[in-house]
Amino acid sequence: MAHKKAGGSSRNGRDSESKRLGVKVYGGQAINAGGIIVRQRGTRMHPGENVGIGKDHTLFALTDGHVNFSTKGAAKKHMVNVVPAAV
């Protein structure tokens, strides 16, 4: 009688879903008010002029304009600003 022993079962095969974090609009690019600039965990980047921050630390534009990244202070904090579009 031909028999085949049961194969072992793998204990692998699990992973968390990616959160799609990071910079969504880069320096010099145009953005509309309410547009998401950066999705992040914690304040890796800080809001500057015309930029708001959500409860999940998402940075978003408060006005229409162009995105500008800079550093500030001795700690070299990464700041995100929106330069308003010329009207």
From Swiss-Prot:
GO terms for cellular component: cytosolic large ribosomal subunit. Gene3D superfamilies: 2.40.50.100. GO terms for molecular function: structural constituent of ribosome. InterPro entries: Ribosomal_bL27, Ribosomal_bL27_CS. PROSITE patterns: RIBOSOMAL_L27. SUPFAM superfamilies: Ribosomal L27 protein-like. Residues 1-21 are annotated as: Disordered. One of its GO terms (biological process) is translation. HAMAP family: Ribosomal_bL27. Belongs to the bacterial ribosomal protein bL27 family. This is Large ribosomal subunit protein bL27. It comes from Paraburkholderia phytofirmans (strain DSM 17436 / LMG 22146 / PsJN). The gene is rpmA.
